[in-house]
A protein has these predicted regions:
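Asp-based phosphoryl-transfer active-site loop
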Residues: 2-17, 91
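Charged helix-capping and loop-helix junction motifs
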Residues: 21-23, 84-85
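Catalytic-core regions built around general acid/base machinery
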Residues: 23-35, 90, 94
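Substrate-recognition element of Asp-dependent hydrolases with the DxDx(T/V) motif
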Residues: 28-51, 66, 104-107
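Glycine-rich loop at the start of a catalytic domain that most often binds anionic cofactors/ligands
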Residues: 51-58, 116-120
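HAD-like small-molecule phosphatases
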Residues: 68-130
Length: 130
């Protein structure tokens, strides 16, 4: 019997319209009610994923930022691996100079982008990052 179920969000758990289907919501609720542990494993920001989890009303671990952060079911930070400041500055400088690259930088509870693209808001149907 499975004890843990983990899933990505984009292209996996979320439908093509970037929303959780009623079936997905019900399945996640049933999994956690049966005592299985659910883990969100995604490249998204932890606040974004936390809103999705809270809207579902379930207890779930979160592995976010492509594995750079891990939060427990209460949202407490268990693990963080941040880029060295000099490396991050170098990467951001290279990417910032190219108009075709959009850079997303997460720092604790903050999210920075080098350019705002309104069309990217379609990815945030289940949670709104302020």
């Amino acid at each position: 019997m499975y004890q843990v179920v983990a899933s990505d969000l984009d292209g996996t758990l979320l439908a093509p319209d970037h929303r959780l289907t009623p079936y997905a919501k019900e399945t996640l609720k049933l999994l956690t009610q049966k005592g299985l542990h659910f883990v969100f494993a995604t490249g998204r920001h932890h606040i974004d994923v936390g809103q999705i989890r809270d809207n579902l009303g379930i207890q779930a671990y979160m592995i976010t930022s492509n594995g750079a952060r891990v939060h427990d079911t209460d949202g407490n930070l268990l693990f963080a691996h941040n880029l060295d400041r000099d490396i991050a500055a170098d990467l951001f400088g290279v990417m910032h100079s190219s108009p075709d690259i959009i850079t997303n930088v997460y720092r604790d509870d903050e999210w920075f982008m080098n350019r705002h693209r309104p069309e990217e808001m379609r990815f945030f149907k289940e949670a709104v990052f302020n």
